Amino acid sequence: MLAGRVRMGQSWNGAGAAGAAGGLVRPAQRALAVPHVSARDPRGVDWRALRAAGARACVFDKDNTLTDPYALELRPEVAGAFAECLEAFGARNVALVSNSAGLAEYDPEGKEADRVERELGCPVLRHALKKPEIEPEALTRHFGCATEEMVMVGDRFLTDVMYGNRMGMLTVKVEAFTGSGERATVRAARWAETRLVGFWMGSLGTQPPAHAFFSHPAAEHSFLKKS
């Protein structure tokens, strides 16, 4: 029942659509959709370098970032990278913020969040607003640090990346694992936003917001593992 409600609700994200519309006319809004770091998946990210540069906490999206859509198991190929992140930051300083598990609209009693926590061994933040709408107080209360000291990792430009950039996080964009299990409207939205943000970045030269972590020597390789 919950999965059905989540799939239906995720077919429309008003805040994400508003972000896209704003980007058409406002350069500053476009910048919020551009990630600081892009990687195929979490395996490409240098978690120790991020920690050395001053990052104190890491926030992950769940679906198509760590798991298949609506699944509870880590994708096998990223399990090692997730363990590296937990080791670099400490398990208490890593959490999931999802538009499914933990979101009051679809998971008011937190039962799905509890299941995810048991399966993934990682806290799931309970929150009231769907990304990219922000609740910085929930994050600072959970982690005990400023949002500017956090990293946001996700697969969507107009939800995960915009959510993180709105709060001054360093944002990491990864590629989705699969469209299988997602509603057709979600796949269409991903296709559209990828091309829209790609146009902003390529043709308009839109850059992400400046971030202090890039002034640290640990940013030598832009927080990507050396190949």
Please annotate each region the language model reported.
Residues 61:
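Active-site residues of response regulator receiver
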Residues 2-56, 71-72, 78-152, 156-227:
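Asp-based, Mg2+/Mn2+-dependent phosphohydrolase catalytic module
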Residues 65-66:
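Hydrophobic "anchor" residues
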